[in-house]
């Protein structure tokens, strides 16, 4: 608490207290202008954190590669050096999470949703550094994780930090700025401001308190974060790939079929994630040493995979252009799909600080392109472009697992600049959502939050017995 007070005083030291009070609130309720101004601050900071997090992860990955090529690779066998470097990087991520902020494990998005429901606390002074540096280690080791979950959680933590610095007491304002930070984080992760806004409005709809001021705050935060991202990284799309034209109307039924298949897989995939998480808990039994040893070994394994099968490692964003350029046969695509399903479950299920958006997009691309290539062979009468099915698959798997079809559609369009494919994306994503709902599947982040709350309750019940 003392450190937090020092932060507040240092920020506001040269601003008259009366001016702060007049700006932030009118009575006990913040003014609309002050909320939007704070949302702009949140978006700017979330954009900086998210953008430099991406830069930091790339720096770690490039440095790891350079070390293998030069100093360490010349002293030790290459395979051993790869295992040691990636294992050490993974250890950093697991240790920081376990020691300082257990809530920073995994994606972090369920934690923000829980905070919006006032059932999870946001220790921003711990979460931001732990997620940033822990994520650098985990993602830099080559594990199959995405950066969007960390940036959303760090963005939400930035929103809570700003409300604490400005001593905002109004619950609705604190809620709005928390959601604004999450939107800013996603906008900075994927250069996708529209998807970031819709993610809060659609995926977080059970927790989000709809009002004109809260919507405006989310929009402003996403815009500011995206401006920061583009100012630093440029205005190119995150994924470089061909620009496709809208497919023939006669082939639209294939997109519905593809969406249905993804609907089935999405339900199975979500259940497999829970099974993987429970399996890792059963393996290390919440013992710190066993947890760190398990994570370090897993990181070392992915260091080895980086040398021999790099397609099975990393978030997968870099793999997507190779897929859509037709560099792999159908059989290879299927094997890569199965392999990346396994590696995604291993990495995300282990509790490493990383997200699952990017790995899911890669999985959707793999299966979607394989489906499109197969359809092109079996239906020569139709003009089929497999790359279109790859893009549709990205949105469909996101929609089936996260249960946010509009967000998935916007995310894919913004990331690939393929605006002409909105119709097949809608058909595929809605088909996936409908099938997933019919099968009774739960949205992934609601499922993860429920599991976290359940495990916390069980630990609290066991605490008196252990103390006794």
From Swiss-Prot:
The record marks 148 as: Mediates proton transfer from the outer aqueous phase to the interior of the protein. It is found in: Cell inner membrane. The keyword Transport applies. Proton-coupled chloride transporter. Functions as antiport system and exchanges two chloride ions for 1 proton. Probably acts as an electrical shunt for an outwardly-directed proton pump that is linked to amino acid decarboxylation, as part of the extreme acid resistance (XAR) response. It catalyses: 2 chloride(in) + H(+)(out) = 2 chloride(out) + H(+)(in). Chloride binds at residues 107, 356-357, 445. InterPro entries: Cl-channel_ClcA, Cl-channel_core, ClC. SUPFAM superfamilies: Clc chloride channel (SSF81340). One of its GO terms (molecular function) is antiporter activity. This is H(+)/Cl(-) exchange transporter ClcA. The chain crosses the membrane at residues 33-69, 77-100, 124-141, 148-166, 215-232, 253-281, 288-309, 330-349, 355-376, 422-438. The gene is clcA. Residues 109-116, 177-189, 193-201, 387-401, 402-404, 405-416, 417-421 dip into the membrane without crossing it. A motif (Selectivity filter part_3) lies at residues 355-359. Keywords: Antiport, Cell inner membrane, Cell membrane, Chloride, Ion transport, Membrane, Transmembrane, Transmembrane helix, Transport. Its main location: membrane. Residues 70-76, 233-252, 310-329, 377-386 are periplasmic. A motif (Selectivity filter part_2) lies at residues 146-150. One of its GO terms (cellular component) is plasma membrane. The record marks 203 as: Mediates proton transfer from the protein to the inner aqueous phase. Residues 1-32, 117-123, 167-176, 202-214, 282-287, 439-468 are cytoplasmic. It is a multi-pass membrane protein. Gene3D superfamilies: Clc chloride channel (1.10.3080.10). A motif (Selectivity filter part_1) lies at residues 106-110. The lineage of its organism: Bacteria, Pseudomonadati, Pseudomonadota, Gammaproteobacteria, Vibrionales. Belongs to the chloride channel (TC 2.A.49) family. ClcA subfamily. Homodimer.
